[in-house]
Amino acid sequence: MASATAPAAAVPTLASPLGQLRHLAEELRLLLPRVRVGEAQETTEEFNREMFWRRLNEAAVTVSREATTLTTVFSQLPLPSAQETQKFCEQVHAAIKAFIAVYYLLPKDQGITLRKLVRGATLDIVDGMAQLMEVLSITPTQSPENNELISYNSVWVACQQMPHIPRDNKAAALLMLTKNVDFVKDAHEEMERAVEECDPYSGLLNDTEENNSDNHNDEDDVLGFPSNQDLYWSEDDQELIIPCLALVRASKACLKKIRILVAENGKKDQVAQLDDIVDISDEISPSVDDLALSIYPPMCHLTVRINSAKLVSVLKKALEITKASHVTPQPEDSWIPLLINAIDHCMNRIKELTQSELEL
């Protein structure tokens, strides 16, 4: 006769505390691709900017608090029990998901540039928390204190940055334009310094020479170190660098002028035009970098010509978009033809100096 007593339900076995942390780190990392491609939540309600930022800041405070709690309990012995760890992990996971949910409330019509900044901050927080879980999952006796502090600090810093994120698309555009100006300024200064010293690899090679002073040149050749003829510019190279530097200076001037126009004339409600200006301006710095890298010896003049042409194309497109936008009133656009003439002059000179490369 079969027993009338039903078998007792099996009680799920919890993973070890450290195992739970490792699992949570994996779960958090799975959220990253979704945040990168996730769309804004559709709603018929009017967007309340003040409420959104208040909720986002509150969510960041909650994440920071959970990071503090977890770091405290797992940085010392004895470790919490499996049941206690489960509760801690659930709280961390809930705090992260709540933060992501608030990010999804930011609609696209508030500006793509602004949304990219908030998305980047969200990714920093999620990734920082995942790093913290991974470090804490190492037993405290094997985990250096500074590693734990660094990982926790990355979460904390990301959360602390939330109140400083621009609140509208104009402010976001100005932040991105300022970064682009700084990038191009750094590239230009590096190029000028290399030209003034006539020794483009001085910083790198000085260290190499000190560490390998007893080695023979033949050994360097075998190991792939450049020979002397590859380390310095020829007279033709130096002549070609002059218009390249001028072109990079024009790029810096272009970005600075665009930033000034956005600051003085940009309207917060013209989000699409501001996004277009930022999008094309974002292409200037990488194009400058490509040109800057191509002038280092051994220099290929054809590559310099190609990279210069790419940069010129981007600059003219940026000027065209800026001129057609609301940030450039009609009386204030006289600088654009002057800058285009300067850009064309640089490119024409580069073409003259590299024409022989095309005829080979």
Curated annotation (Swiss-Prot):
Gene Ontology CC annotations of this record: cytoplasm; nucleus
Keywords: Acetylation, Cell cycle, Cytoplasm, Nucleus, Phosphoprotein
Annotated localization: Cytoplasm; Nucleus
PTM entry text: Phosphorylated.
Residues with PTM N-acetylalanine: A2
Physiological role: May negatively regulate cell cycle progression. May act at least in part via inhibition of the cyclin-D1/CDK4 complex, thereby preventing phosphorylation of RB1 and blocking E2F-dependent transcription.
Quaternary structure note: Interacts with CCND1 and GRAP2. May also interact with COPS5, RPLP0, SIRT6, SYF2 and TCF3.
Protein name per Swiss-Prot or TrEMBL: Cyclin-D1-binding protein 1
Organism the protein comes from: Pongo abelii (Sumatran orangutan)
Name of encoding gene: CCNDBP1
